[in-house]
């Protein structure tokens, strides 16, 4: 069963808090899977593995996420670390898909 959504202030036990964190984690994984589907589609559209790495686009994404993190009162450096990890994962995945397609024609 999905736990009932509670505001942080309404969580009175560690179990309450953990249930909410687990609920959010499931949502994050669902969003990552959705994002990954778009990354896969991008890899299908791109024709050269070098296209997977676009430093200008990456830095624009990082700047946008740092700003959003600040607006949400989150640590911008930690947000950047998370996004760089996500971007590196996606870039490497795209490169692999594109390179495999080029090899197999």
Each predicted region: which residue ranges?
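Domain-level signature for soluble enzymes in the chorismate/prephenate branch of the shikimate pathway
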Residues: 1-105
């Amino acid at each position: 069963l999905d736990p009932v959504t509670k505001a942080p202030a309404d969580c009175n036990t560690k179990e309450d808090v953990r249930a909410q964190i687990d609920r959010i984690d499931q949502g994050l994984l669902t969003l990552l899977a959705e994002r990954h589907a778009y990354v896969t589609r991008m890899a299908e559209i791109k024709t050269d593995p070098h296209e997977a790495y676009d430093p200008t686009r990456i830095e624009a994404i990082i700047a946008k996420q740092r700003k959003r993190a600040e607006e949400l009162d989150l640590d911008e450096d930690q947000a950047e670390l998370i996004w760089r990890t996500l971007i590196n994962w996606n870039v490497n995945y795209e490169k692999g898909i594109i390179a495999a397609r080029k090899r197999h024609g």
